[in-house]
UniProtKB/Swiss-Prot annotation:
This is Putative phosphoenolpyruvate synthase regulatory protein. It catalyses: [pyruvate, water dikinase] + ADP = [pyruvate, water dikinase]-phosphate + AMP + H(+); [pyruvate, water dikinase]-phosphate + phosphate + H(+) = [pyruvate, water dikinase] + diphosphate. Bifunctional serine/threonine kinase and phosphorylase involved in the regulation of the phosphoenolpyruvate synthase (PEPS) by catalyzing its phosphorylation/dephosphorylation. Keywords: Kinase, Nucleotide-binding, Serine/threonine-protein kinase, Transferase. It holds the Pfam family Kinase-PPPase. It comes from the Bacteria. ADP binds at residues 153-160.
Amino acid sequence: MSTIRPVFYVSDGTGITAETIGHSLLTQFSGFSFITDRMSFVDDPEKAREACARIQAAGERYQVRPIVVNSCVDQSLSLILADSGALMLDVFAPFIEPLERELASPRLARVGQAHGMVDFDTYHRRINAMNFALTHDDGIAVNYDDADVILVAVSRAGKTPTCIYLALHYGVRAANYPLTDEDLESDRLPPRLRNYRRKLFGLTIDPDRLQQIRQERRPNSRYANLETCKREVAAAEVMFQMERIPTLSTTHTSIEEISSKVLATLGLQRELY
């Protein structure tokens, strides 16, 4: 039976940084059932005290010491949170002091700076990339001239979530093209993709996993039949090999890893927002 541990991601901003780092840490441990809670915009003493009370209550409820992954910049807020008795994991503390020494400069303790909308050009680039991903999802639009990348795969192999992640976190204009039965009759690229070979990246997936995903969407249909999944995946992989399209299996790969691999393979230099 898994051991329950309450985990809180506390931040003076969105909490994305704390949650991302915390999740990466927790995945290193098995045999635990982590009950997570993100507390965003804890940016004044009153909110910090409220957060502290919630953390203490969780410790009493589960009769175990809570874990807090904290990205609050203001140390006075961190001290209030520490009164909860939780294990405090400060996201920035291990790095700030060495950086201050190396740069011979004190940090600017700006609340919410990590995900603040500082650069309007960057903000609009992300919004435009998101709009592009939505309008070019599943082959809805096929004007690929402005695309940075075109993900190609059979249905339900992870194209859409990867495109959205690339747009939101990297400002990448990512389109995706679903391979149809007609496309898979040939081991050559569909005509509408042939002029964009350098933008293509293929996603594949284990047929058993694909069948599970499709079964949830359309139970007991031909679409979700295991033999259909095997045939489609095999045909897509032959096409990718014949056309020398870079390919990655999404079966045991996170969206973050898929996105990083796509960017590196296609030579797209983008910073994570």
